[in-house]
Amino acid sequence: MLSKASLPVFLLVLLGIASCKKVAETDPNNPPANPANKIAPDGFNYITTKDVTVSITALTNRNKAISGVPVSIYSLNKGVRGQLIFKGVTNAQGVLDAKASMSAYMDTVVVDANYLGLIQNVLVTTSDNTLNCTIGGANGYSGNIVGVLQSNGGPANAANVIRSAASSNGGMVSMDINGVKTNTKFSYLGTYNSNGRPNNLETPGDEIGVDMLNTINASLPEQKKVPDVHPEYIANDATTNINVREDAEVWITFVHEGAGYRNALGFYTYDTKTPPTSLADITEINFIYPNASLKGSSGEMVSGDKVKLGTFKAGTTIGLVLFQNAWNGKDVSVGATALFSDANLNPEPNSDLRKHNVFLQYKNTFLIGFEDIRRDYSGCDQDFI
């Protein structure tokens, strides 16, 4: 009997405003003769700022403290992130306790934890001059968080929808990719809920520990271009796929996403000895995460969500494919741009720009990060998360 190896795979993607008070220009014991000319009623409060007690906690998905997380608080200005109000770092207990001065009218602000693995740009209400929230934790976030600042990813692609009935136990649908005739068959690995979160999640999910998160953040610093800081990650000889060397069960675990799009993630397989040379060689794609978006950020995924891909024979290669902004609120639209872990299948005319994922190793786990925008487009940040 062949032994089976467990091959887990993780996916990854200060300003104080001075208060203003009116100064009396006359002797308070000798008021003006014409009080009718006063510009405000008695008791009017001219104070325009307030001091807010801030308590922000950063936790892993198993509620363990994350220290050293940079946290910024911004004003909310017409639905977008405005002026920086305060900046700080969580302590050894994963807590940022501080006082922040902000405009008196502000009842909702933007709190951004610049740390992969934690939801970013959350909307937090202030109540009784306190701002209290937890970023991370088993549910993704808690406290006075009322939502997430939504970036404008545009509407999902509506072409070539794969209906939910086309699941692994309900048949397949044959369609094309990136406008190329392929007759590729699409299906879902399992059913999913109304927000595109798979129903076939493993219980319990995986713990995403502090050490792993720190490694991810050090390896893939957000808003840093991978070609500049780690060109070796996308070198021609860099691994981008999962090559099964002995019979193995394979799982994939969601860690983080920082996309403005509602992306769908799928996988395909082929014999390692005969890699695909064109899109027509991709005969079948199974969707793992119909909507790979975090809870509160146009989705319902939480860090640690784990799905079993299946059992694979030695000599099999597993490739990943991301369909850009393909979740339409109900199904996946495969008319969207598809970006593959096999770089030669990607649409950029310049072959030097075709790699769209990085493949790193952490202990016995592989970490995968995807760039979800065509790399020849000006809007691509090239951070691969």
Predicted features along the sequence, with ranges:
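Bacterial Sec-dependent N-terminal signal peptides
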Residues: L7, V13-F44
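Bacterial N-terminal signal peptides that target proteins for export
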Residues: M1-P8
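Extracellular distal adhesion/interaction modules in secreted or cell-surface proteins
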Residues: N29-F384
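N-terminal processing/targeting junctions
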Residues: P8, I17-A18, R62, G260
